[in-house]
Amino acid sequence: MMETYKRGLAEATGWLVFLSLLMVLALAVPKTVFDADSKDFILLIGAVGIWRYSMGGVHFLRGMLFLHVVYPYYRRRVRQLGSAADPSHVFLMVTSFRIDALTTAMVYRSVIREAIDSGYPTTVVCSIVEMSDEVLVRSLWEKMNPPDRVSLDFVRIPGTGKRDGLAYGFRAISRHLPDDDAVVAVIDGDTVLDHGVVKKTVPWFKLFPNVGGLTTNEFCEVQGGYVMSEWHKLRFAQRHINMCSMALSKRVLTMTGRMSVFRARVVTNPEFITDVENDHLEHWRLGRFKFLTGDDKSSWFSLMRLGYDTFYVPDAAINTVEHPPEKSFIKASRKLMYRWYGNNLRQNSRALKLGARRLGWFTMLVLFDQRVSMWTSLLGLVVAILASLKYSIAFLLVYLLWIGLTRLVLTLLLSLSGHRIGPAYPLILYYNQIVGALVKIYVFFRLDRQSWTRQPTKLERGLASFQRWFNAWSSRAMTFSAASIFVAVLLTIV
């Protein structure tokens, strides 16, 4: 009780400080800014971001429509199916590597509990590297004593990355010869399942015969400081709305590695297994290279290529235990952004080549926006800085006031997602916009550079010395050229 009171008081103080800063900024800007007849009127500063705000607004409206109207209708239809929607068999596959014993115990305890409580014939498939994990799982298994319809299968894998772990697990499931009504849940080694998540996810495959995979809502517990914790929670709130928006078209853009559920005939398809295990890109400048990370994007692309739909179940929740890769928030967030945005951009260009007939026009528009957002996100800040240097500091003050007000509104809208909001969200939103855009630009010209945050595995391509030199220097040259053109164009406009 006391902890809740202290947290509430701290958050109230944070909101008061943020609102006070907005008032100070409002007092600092010229009075003409608030004059609707003035050329400096505050809303003009938002014109440069009209594309970004319109895309965000469309996602929000679509997300709320799905969450509060469409999904409840679908859920009623699923409940009407009753036991007819039950799968013939459920496989719960967990991949674990270099995760602490406490987290591993929490994860497997939740998985075994779900296998018992679901009532379905279930096989828990443990894709593991270390013997200590096997000993821990066997101990939990004996303690929880599941019924005969629940079985345990261990798959020992080399510690060469998650892709290999998934492929070994998929092949192990193939040896069980699952039928067309069987489903497979792929669960990360740091994901704790909420009560009832299996029963909430598996019936959807009967309602939607063409859905090949679906993913779930995420909440998190962060093993880090306050800002790092809020940063992750904000990300999951934004993810929830975007997932709901894309689920309206049955085109959810990623099969989240933390927990996604597939038809068994998908994960046992040799093409799908190859796509996940040996995904690669043929780049015009960087050559051919394998994907080290981003198995969630590879599985999504494979589903699209094979002709399946994707879906999102917002009331099926999982809880992830986040371990930041660095103690410093700046370093940790940059490292995570580098991996996430790299995975995103590596899939983007080839996803667009699937075309509107396969993806739909809205999905094509979203994929296009992912490519241009790295520049549009920086537009307002760069214009404000140039205008303040060329004309008056008032332009920068107006811009900062605009950012404060709009991020406050965005934060309040995020509360409608069902995720908790905090006073740090407006600042973190802007941090994500600017730093995220810079990271995207950097990684866009270096798509071949990949590494894990949990293990020291890096992509080794065995290139000749000249090819390595050419890739490095051409990446620098293209980054500098693109940034120079961007600034030069804005200088001619301002």
Swiss-Prot record:
Entry-linked SUPFAM superfamilies: Nucleotide-diphospho-sugar transferases (SSF53448)
Cysteines joined through disulfide linkages: none
What enzyme category does the UniProt record give? transferase
Q: Which residues cross the membrane?
A: 12-34, 49-71, 381-403, 423-445
Pathways per UniProt: Glycan biosynthesis; alginate biosynthesis
Output the superkingdom of the source species. Bacteria
The protein's matches in InterPro entries, at most eight in alphabetical order, are given as: Nucleotide-diphossugar_trans (IPR029044)
**The family this protein is said to belong to:** Belongs to the glycosyltransferase 2 family.
Q: What is this protein called?
A: Mannuronan synthase
What lineage does UniProt assign to this protein's organism? Bacteria, Pseudomonadati, Pseudomonadota, Gammaproteobacteria, Pseudomonadales
